[in-house]
Amino acid sequence: GQAGKDVIWVPTPDEVVDRMLTMAQVTPQDFVMDLGAGDGKIAIAAAKKFGARAVGIEYNPEMAKHANANAAAAGVAGNGAGKATIRQADIFQTDIKEATVITLYLLPALNMKLRPQILAMRPGTRVVSHSFTMEDWEADEISSIDGRRAYFWMVPAQVMGNWTLEANNQRTDLALEQTFQKINGSVGIGPVHAGLRDTRLRGPFIQFSYVGQDRVRRDFTGRVDGAKMEGSFRDEKGGEGKWTAAKK
């Protein structure tokens, strides 16, 4: 191992790196940031095998130099798609918001210190961590590779609060509760607050259902865009249409 700022560097086995990047479904359209890059292995694989633009952040200057030499030896040094570069920097002083994929092999306390920054990223950003969790933010997938664990999350949109839902030229109050990617809530129909069913939030995509006073179930799917949502709905009698919602 090699000492970084807050972590002792231990290389991640190749098959774990592969699985991490596969879990994140990395493509040449992605910008992968590896936080705590060590020898650059994850950033190099993201560029070479997955065709992504990759940037590793490494605090130890010697290690960063070594990682860039590894990228050059692998034929992927540089910027742009299919290229990897390792920057000597502090991960907590680094702007990560442009990344579409974040990879981590840090200590639990560092994951937790980064967590607010990660949750503030663009909904749909993919995050993979080797060995360590994000505590009560449950992973969307856990893979095991020769006894080592890799955890995957997708940054959820922020939907908690009260919304005005418009569908079929009718307005209703939609109240949403949220704990990370888990959501629940109700729709106000006159004096009745009908509970939501089959709720799901995956990145910017939301779905929920409820049974109206007419005893008909309606299924809503849509996309969250800040203080707005829009999508389509269907009811079990074959009716369908568009819906929008605005945050109050």
Language model features with spans:
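Glycine-rich SAM-binding Motif I of class I
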Residues: G40-I44
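S-adenosyl-L-methionine
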Residues: A64-E98
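Class I SAM-dependent transferase core
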Residues: G1-T27
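Active-site segment flanking the S-adenosylmethionine/decSAM binding pocket
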Residues: A84-R126
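C-terminal substrate-binding/active-site "lid" region of AdoMet-derived donor-dependent transferases
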Residues: A109-M160
